């Protein structure tokens, strides 16, 4: 599945953090991410045909993840559809989807290294991390360090995982697979 990387940087540059997150911002971001992934796969189905077993998926029935999430999350962020979900659901019902599953949130260590991003949806453990692979040792500094160093929240500075858990709850509204959550 396609995941999210660099969430810590996104939070820092938007003046929010894991302990006291702007859940409306997270909701808006995750909704657009999910919508455009589903839309791209639905458009591919028009070009190349729907995936085998499309009629056995929720997508084939025109059902999207933001219709099946645990509604208790609405207590954190009221449900709002900013994107044209009605049109997308109609398209899914008519032409199907090319990929039966699209989204999964995992640590994304390799992708983060290649793109000089923070790991997936996780808070950084330090401003500089040392990562080792078969190719050698890599020292990686969080993106935008000089500009956002006072905005980043490091994992060990969190007093409680409550804000992090709330972020994960909001993200799950838009995901069709799973989330790898770490509450170190």
Residue ranges of predicted features:
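Core structural elements
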Residues: 1-15
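Amphipathic, positively biased hydrophobic alpha-helical segments used for protein targeting
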Residues: 12-14, 52, 119-120, 131
């Amino acid at each position: 599945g396609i995941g999210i990387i660099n969430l810590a940087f996104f939070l820092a540059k938007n003046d929010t953090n894991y302990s006291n997150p702007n859940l409306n911002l997270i909701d808006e971001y995750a909704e657009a991410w999910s919508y455009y992934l589903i839309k791209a796969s639905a458009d591919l189905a028009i070009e190349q045909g729907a995936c085998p077993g499309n009629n056995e998926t929720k997508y084939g029935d025109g059902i999207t993840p933001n219709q099946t999430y645990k509604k208790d999350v609405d207590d954190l962020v009221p449900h709002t559809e900013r994107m044209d979900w009605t049109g997308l659901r109609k398209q899914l019902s008519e032409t199907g989807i090319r990929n039966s599953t699209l989204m999964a949130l995992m640590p994304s260590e390799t992708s983060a290294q290649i793109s000089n991003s923070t790991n997936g949806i996780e808070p950084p453990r330090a401003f500089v991390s040392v990562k080792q692979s078969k190719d050698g040792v890599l020292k990686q500094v969080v993106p935008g360090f000089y500009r956002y160093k006072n905005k980043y929240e490091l994992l060990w500075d969190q007093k409680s995982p409550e804000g992090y858990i709330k972020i994960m709850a909001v993200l799950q509204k838009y995901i069709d697979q799973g989330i790898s959550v770490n509450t170190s």
